């Protein structure tokens, strides 16, 4: 479980698809800019993925699974989405997540960036001089279980 239920969702975006395999909610997704096309809600090319050093889209709020839907169904109570389906992305608000680089220990007030080494993770290490990878701000340090409160505010700084 990478995302706790204690969260505040001020703004979400439901215009993106996730097709990069399976994913656990709570990580930072980036735009799959190579495939983006159009601005309509059902543009199949508008995709997000767990990536490193990409343009942040927000925090993934669904579990992406790859199930045989002829034998079983998606668990609606877990917010499961089939691979290739639409996902909900948090663009403004705060969450408690453990999708944080294992090698860092963020402090309250540190800026949260997309990790340059671990796909889907957040870090407090700035990727060079650009602020375009900033997702928001850490509002706490990691607790005993590895979770930290992260305030998300996107779109962020434009470089």
Regions found by a protein language model. Give the residues of each.
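Surface-exposed, low-hydrophobicity beta-strand/loop segments enriched in small/polar/acidic residues
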Residues: 1-159
């Amino acid at each position: 479980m990478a995302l706790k239920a204690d969260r505040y969702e001020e703004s979400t975006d439901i215009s993106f698809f996730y097709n990069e395999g399976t994913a656990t909610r709570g990580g930072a997704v980036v735009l799959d800019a190579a495939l983006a096309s159009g601005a309509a809600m059902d543009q199949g090319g508008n995709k997000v993925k767990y990536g490193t050093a990409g343009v942040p889209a927000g925090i993934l709020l669904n579990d992406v699974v790859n199930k045989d839907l002829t034998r079983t169904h998606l668990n609606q109570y877990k917010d499961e989405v089939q691979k290739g389906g639409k996902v909900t992305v948090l663009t403004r608000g705060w969450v408690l997540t453990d999708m944080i680089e294992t090698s860092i220990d963020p402090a309250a007030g540190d800026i949260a960036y997309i990790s340059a080494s671990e796909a889907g993770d957040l870090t407090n290490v700035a990727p060079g001089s650009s602020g375009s990878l900033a997702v928001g701000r850490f509002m706490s340090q990691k607790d005993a279980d590895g979770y930290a409160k992260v305030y998300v505010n996107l779109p962020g700084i434009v470089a």
